[in-house]
Amino acid sequence: MPHDILLNTLSANAPHWRALPLKDKIQLLDTMVIALQSLNVEGHLEWSAASLRTQLMDPVAQELEGAFEALISVSVIKGQLTRLRSTLLALSSTGAATRPKSLRVHTTSKNEEQIIAEVFPLETADKFGPQGKWTGELWLKPGHEATQASCMVEPAAGDAPAPTRVCVVLGAGNQGFLTLVDALDVLFVQNETVLVKHHPLRGYQDKFMRVVFRPLFDRGFMGAVFDTTVAESSALVSDPRVGHVHMTGGKATHDAIMWGSSQEESADRRRRNEPKLKARMTSELGCVTPWVVVPAVFTEKELLHQASHLAAVLNANSSCNCNAPKCVMMSGTWAQREQYVEAVKSALRELPPTPPYYPGETGRYDRFRQAYPSSSHQIQSNADVVRRVRVKAHGGSDEDGVAANGVDIGPTDLPFLTIDMEIEADGTCDNNYALVNEAFAPVVAFVTVHNAETTTSFMEAASNICNEKMFGTLSCTVILHPTTQREYPMETERLIANLKYGTVCINAWTALCYAVDTCAWGAYPGEDPKNAESGCGFVRNTLMFDHVQKSVVRAPLIDQAQVVHVMKPPLNKKENVVDIVAFILKPGLATFGRVVLPRCCCSRLFCGSLAMVLVISCVTIGVLASGVLKQ
């Protein structure tokens, strides 16, 4: 096997990594932050340009998208590094991980006690910036104490020796930073050595990852491979030196690894309950993500704000995100339903479409059109479509949107597909295809729920439909007007408690919850490995809680963070976004000045948006005040 040497090294070093003193791991994290900074803004823009080419986009024509991708990657990766450092520092100095702001006890519908840890805001800096008004909670499994960092406890004398087996991380194909985040979690939270296998779409990121993770590569705690054949990949995960496989990807890949690639083998192994994979498997798979709009009287400003928010997240990354909203659920008696749907469609028309770059995307899109021939509609974009450059990003077919490297064959975008669906409060409907099939394509269903006449009956029906009739348990958004929360406090809390999703977000896209780096991300616990949907296990668990059930994040109905990705002034200029990237990389007065001062002095650039100046000022002051980000 080609990877024998790597596996031998990682296996031999696994006990050393597990026993490595915390101060040494903290030093490694510090070195990694310095390495992340060493790429400078230019290096991160080069990284994002490679990602854009993978997405069949021209990095020159789409320079703003490239700057935003750099902003997201830098924010997520540095946030995780610094938050892990804070947790390990607390463990080292006090013997306990960073504690939450507070703990409270919730009594479940089964009369069980459940601990809820309030984890955001955790520090002063968390209260500043676009997410300053948000709150984040970790709900633990009922009956468990709020224990943390069990994997970091040194074995007592006489205990079994530390494991010598390796974790293989199978990298995501739709977002570059996900692989790095997964590797960080396995290394520092689960305390295992890691061999990363890059996704065929993302092999370009190997050189960037080797810069950031260099101290771990140098000491034999981490390795990486790409361009492996199917046979080599299968042999890799089946190797006896591999004790854990973690993947971010699709259900079909998960099932092929776990149960076998052929239908016959898979069915036989499931029947005998004999998985093909002998190692432990954790995963973050897909979901038909609900976007539940609880009926209320919204002002025009509130309605248009949330419509713009939804349209932007639908369009992001060609809608190839595991948390892309796929079913917008509304009450049939909501007076503003048609106005809201038309506002979302109108906002979609103003957004430039993204190319169908992901393997099989066009085929999945067509299958949804075929499933709903009379109730599906294509939204034609009014935005200027920049000519795309297709690149040979993977070994797919022409259906996947792959042509010869560098050949400009013009716009090949898929118009956004909307589907009108009707469903009864008990979950019955004429055609449930959109509820049980993840599109991973620019498709969304507007689902009208009938016979749920009141606000409370709609909330109950929506919860039951999401839990019982829809594919996946990864994440869910609920749009809750403040008046609804005031008028129905017990009912809204019951809705949040009853939703069986690993992340429940109030009033915002769940990807923005992923950015709250004290919350965990993963499927709701309890999925059957024989019929996995959204997976098993959590990542981004920087506070190292042992028994996470789900994250709950609450945002205001109107909030700057909800539309930061819409690229409105001043974030519609590459240089403005790049300055923020520079500040996040190296917070200091010089980078602070580049973010704030030129914008304060140039009202034409800001188009009068003093509010944004204040937002950015709060972000930067908060970061400067935070000991977490200081070097």
Language-model region placement:
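Long, low-complexity, polar/charged, intrinsically disordered or flexibly structured peripheral segments
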Residues: E112-A160, G395-N405, L417-Y433
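PLP-dependent aminotransferase-like
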Residues: V166-V168, L178-A231, D268
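Structural signal for hydrophobic packing residues in well-ordered secondary-structure cores
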Residues: A14, V33-L36, N40, H44, ...
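Short loop-to-beta-strand entry elements in the cores of soluble alpha/beta enzymes
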Residues: L28-L29, Q190-L201, V225, L277-A296, ...
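N-terminal Rossmann-like NAD(P)+-binding subdomain of aldehyde/semialdehyde dehydrogenases
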Residues: M1-E145, D185, H198-G203, V212-F217, ...
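C-terminal core of ALDH-fold dehydrogenases
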Residues: Q27, S457-H565, S626
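Conserved NAD(P)+-binding/catalytic subdomain of aldehyde/semialdehyde dehydrogenases
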Residues: V166, P215-M329, G526-A532
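NAD(P)-dependent aldehyde/semialdehyde dehydrogenase
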Residues: A296-V297, A316, C322, M330-L474
